[in-house]
Regions:
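Structural detector for internal amphipathic alpha-helices that build alpha-solenoid repeat scaffolds
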Residues: 43-44, 50-60, 82-93, 113-123, ...
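Short inter-helical turns and helix N-cap capping residues of alpha-solenoid HEAT/ARM repeat scaffolds
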Residues: 76-77, 108-111, 136-141, 167-168, ...
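Membrane-interacting alpha-helical segments
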Residues: 38-41, 79-81, 232-233, 261
Length: 279
């Protein structure tokens, strides 16, 4: 049955009349049928990008998939609740149901909290900044990666500057991840400015994003920032730079400023070993 639903979804969402009229799935009236339809919609969303989100939302609401999943979330616990929330994060939900989901953002369960935020963002992309600002939890790599997936599929508008210019640390992190994800070279100066951030997560995200984008490591702000790291933080960062393909010449400023001779030699040996590996 799921294959039949997937074919119907593909035809409706990719045809010239996408989003027009109603698409009903008569066999989805019962609980089992609703679940199969929810899984089919989620599978379609995972496998495709750039489709008409409004048309998909119409299918979800016309067939009561979002209301069904919200009821299952309320009645379930543990992994079953997370499973239903993951499905809802891909199908989206109508605005009237979102307050019931928002309450779950404060859950002690990290997965429940994560998907509560993702559901809000997927259901109302224009409210992404507000949703992230209101999120009380920390923006872990898992949370940011899930948001990036939705962004890649075209669910979320890209506007990194208002995020990074915000005083909210979670928004700053999301803005930095957007720059990293899309490799926005003209935003490098914004990243350099974030090296002065007192927040360790923002500072580290900016530093590693600069490295991923092959930015210059000779700037004074970079050298000073690295000098302020602990021994183990510097060691880990040097290893990352070597893996990213930096040469000893491009890292000369960092090597000259390195106060620990062990790390200076370690950096050079790492770069040389990676060169040998690449032939």
């Amino acid at each position: 049955m799921q294959d039949t639903y997937l074919l119907a979804l593909a035809e409706y969402l990719s045809g010239p009349d996408a989003g027009r009229g109603e698409v009903r799935f008569p066999q989805s009236r019962g609980r089992r049928g609703k679940m199969i339809l929810a899984e089919a919609i989620a599978a379609f969303a995972e496998m495709n990008c750039g489709y008409d989100c409004a048309a998909m939302h119409k299918i979800v609401t016309d067939n009561g998939v979002d209301a069904f999943l919200v009821r299952r979330i309320a009645r379930s616990r543990s992994w079953n609740r997370v499973r239903y929330m993951q499905l809802l994060s891909l199908t989206g939900a109508r605005p009237s149901l979102l307050p019931r989901i928002k309450r779950l953002e404060d859950s002690p369960d990290a997965y429940v909290s994560l998907f509560a935020l993702i559901i809000r963002i997927s259901s109302a992309p224009e409210q992404t900044i507000a949703a992230v600002r209101e999120f009380s939890g920390a923006m872990s790599h898992r949370v940011l990666s899930e948001i990036m997936l939705r962004l890649w599929r075209g669910f979320i508008p890209v506007a990194y500057e208002p995020m990074i210019c915000s005083d909210n640390e979670n928004l700053k992190l999301l803005g930095i991840y957007i720059i990293r994800f899309f490799g926005i070279e003209e935003a490098q100066n914004i990243l350099y400015a974030q090296l002065d951030s007192p927040n360790g997560a923002v500072h580290d995200a900016a530093m590693y994003t600069l490295a991923i984008m092959k930015s210059s490591m000779t700037r004074k702000c970079v050298v000073q920032s690295v000098a302020g790291m602990s021994f183990f933080q510097r060691r880990r960062f040097y290893k990352f730079l070597a893996a990213e393909g930096y040469s000893t010449r491009s890292l000369s400023a960092l090597q000259s400023a390195e106060t620990d001779s062990r790390l200076g030699g370690y950096m050079e040996s790492l770069v040389n070993s990676y060169k040998k590996m690449l032939g």
